[in-house]
From Swiss-Prot:
It comes from Xanthomonas campestris pv. campestris (strain ATCC 33913 / DSM 3586 / NCPPB 528 / LMG 568 / P 25). GO terms for biological process: beta-glucan biosynthetic process. Belongs to the OpgD/OpgG family. Pfam families: MdoG. The gene is opgD. Keywords: Periplasm, Signal. One of its GO terms (cellular component) is outer membrane-bounded periplasmic space. This is Glucans biosynthesis protein D. Coiled coil: none annotated.
Length: 533
């Protein structure tokens, strides 16, 4: 499948999540019991793993289907006008804290998802019912659609706030969640396969969800998912705890059908068009456009790393080799409205997503894929864990991790962290430039920097390494407005080529590191574009 086409559609559809399900007048209707199929059957996670294992032993069959013509021909606005009725919400007739509503098939969503309700350890399939939907401006009516159509996915909301969801599962293996800010942003996936290899990427599908009815006093919703694709099948358990930071405790069991070249565990999918450090696509009136601005990593060896994101001119792939990582994630550190000026999509409220392994993951690498994009409708950033050992047919791969969705990750370095990265033409203002160079200004705050910034005797130095080229005008000086420090340097390319240059920087004093490690990858412009003015 072509990644750009798939993700452009998925990003557009997911962008509308969190909209009210129906106008307020429809929310007060009395709950209606949902129609169910068959008889309740015993269910637990071990049984679901058995189902996934059996799938992997059989030849793969596509789960996509040809939809009725009226659904195939829906445009974006028509599809978005189809809303699930509050009076048909799952668990609406109970006393618990949560409810679930369902997404309709149509537009980009052609894979029916079977959804089951689990009560007292027994699962029963929920029947698609056209009467459960308000078809809005779609031009559709219940009589036009088959009664066995199926669903596209589901969303969760609290009983106290029925018109806003806090998590949604829709399209392939994509899902999203929000923290207290209530603003959707980046997505997660159940699995990534062959992302950034240069060849076709495979997008596994969740083909069934099992929603366990929570106890009335529970703050957690448990969801199970059955995943399938040409290369692998899998069973997932999500324990979703809603709060200021939403936490998903995830267990997955994967069963490969064939060897997988690049397996991505805990994949985060985001968007970066333009920002302080990368203005290649800055023709928009808004100063910055991104769901997240950097990849943070806490390595197995205890090092904290910050890698600002870019919108590169060509596909860019980076791997950060590690063993038993403690965590990683795509973060939105810049939370200042003035830096975005968008009062429609509120980029400053977009959630960070932190991946925390529950046990040792062994050897592998955190991998980052950055894809060129011309606008914000394309999710062009992916980060995931790739095990060093390639999965083989017949194996069982068990992976457990937690996802944290919120304004800040649950763990942070005691050292100072990077708060901004800016770049521009190098040289000394007022003096004629004899050669091309590119300036980097990296701001750090936190840790011991506030105290050191006040100490005239403090000797803070920038420790800088580059893979190619030379550096000049290197400095580290107090930045009192931030109660921190600014490191600055110019990078001179070694030749007229455009080969990427890797940069590594941190601040230290008295031989001791003061900051997390800042990593960057810079692509020098072609010789024809190197203006020195």
């Amino acid at each position: 499948m072509q990644r750009r086409h798939f993700l452009k559609n998925a990003a557009a559809a997911l962008a509308a999540l969190g909209l009210p399900a129906l106008p307020p007048w429809a929310l007060a209707a009395k709950a209606v019991g949902l129609r169910r199929l068959g008889q309740p059957q015993p269910f637990d996670y071990a049984w679901l793993k058995g189902q996934a294992r059996a799938l992997a032993k059989a030849p793969y069959k596509s789960h996509k289907q040809v939809l009725p013509g009226p659904l195939e021909s829906l445009n974006w606005d028509q599809y978005q006008s189809i809303r699930y009725r509050q009076d048909h919400a799952l668990w609406a007739d109970g006393n618990g804290k949560f409810q679930a509503k369902f997404f309709h098939l149509g537009l980009y969503f052609h894979t029916p998802v079977h959804i089951y309700d689990i009560v007292d350890g027994k699962a029963q399939q929920l029947a698609y019912d056209p009467a459960a939907f308000d078809y809005g401006r779609s031009g559709l009516g219940g009589k036009q659609l088959p009664k066995d159509l199926g669903f596209a996915g589901f969303r969760l909301n609290t009983r106290k706030d029925t018109d806003r969801d806090f998590s949604a599962f829709l399209g392939a293996s994509y899902f999203r969640a929000v923290g207290k800010e209530g603003q959707y942003g980046q997505s997660a996936r159940g699995l990534a396969i062959d992302t950034g290899t240069g060849g076709p990427e495979e997008f596994p599908d969740f083909i069934a969800y099992y929603l366990e009815q929570p106890a009335d006093d529970s703050d957690t919703v448990v969801v199970y998912g059955l995943l399938d694709s040409p290369s692998v099948s899998g069973a997932y358990r999500f324990a979703i705890t809603n709060g200021e930071v939403l936490v998903m405790d995830i267990d997955s069991a994967l069963y490969p059908r064939k060897a997988i070249e690049r397996l991505g565990i805990g994949p985060c999918t985001s968007m970066y068009q333009t920002g302080e450090n990368d203005r290649r696509m800055d023709w928009d009136w808004r100063p910055e456009i991104h769901d997240t601005d950097g990849l943070a990593m806490w390595t197995g060896g205890g090092e904290w790393i910050w890698r600002p994101l870019c919108n590169p001119p060509h596909l860019r792939f980076n791997m950060f080799v590690d063993e038993n990582p403690r965590g990683f994630g795509l973060l939105q550190r810049d939370r200042n409205f003035d830096h975005y000026q968008d009062d429609g999509v509120f980029y400053e409220k977009r959630p960070c997503l932190w991946v925390e392994p529950k046990s040792g993951w062994g050897k592998g690498s955190v991998q980052l894929v950055e894809i060129p994009t011309v606008d914000e409708t394309f999710d062009n950033i992916v980060a995931f864990w790739n095990p060093q050992a390639k999965p083989q047919p017949g194996q069982e791969l068990l992976m457990g991790y937690r996802l944290y969705w919120g304004a800040h990750p649950p763990a942070s370095s005691p050292l100072a962290h990077c708060v901004a990265t800016r770049t521009g033409l190098g040289g000394i203002v007022g003096q004629k430039r004899s050669h091309f160079s590119w300036r980097f200004a990296v701001d750090f705050a936190g840790g011991e920097l506030a105290a050191l910034a006040k100490d005239p005797k403090a000797k803070v130095e920038a420790v800088l390494q580059v893979s190619r080229g030379t550096t000049e005008i290197v400095s580290a000086r107090p930045l009192h407005e931030l109660k921190g420090y600014r490191a600055m340097f110019d990078l001179v390319p070694p030749d007229e080529g455009t080969q990427q240059i890797d940069i590594r920087l941190f601040l230290r004093a008295n031989g001791k590191p003061l900051t997390e490690t800042w990593l960057y990858q810079w692509t020098p412009p072609p010789a024809s574009e190197r203006k020195i003015y």
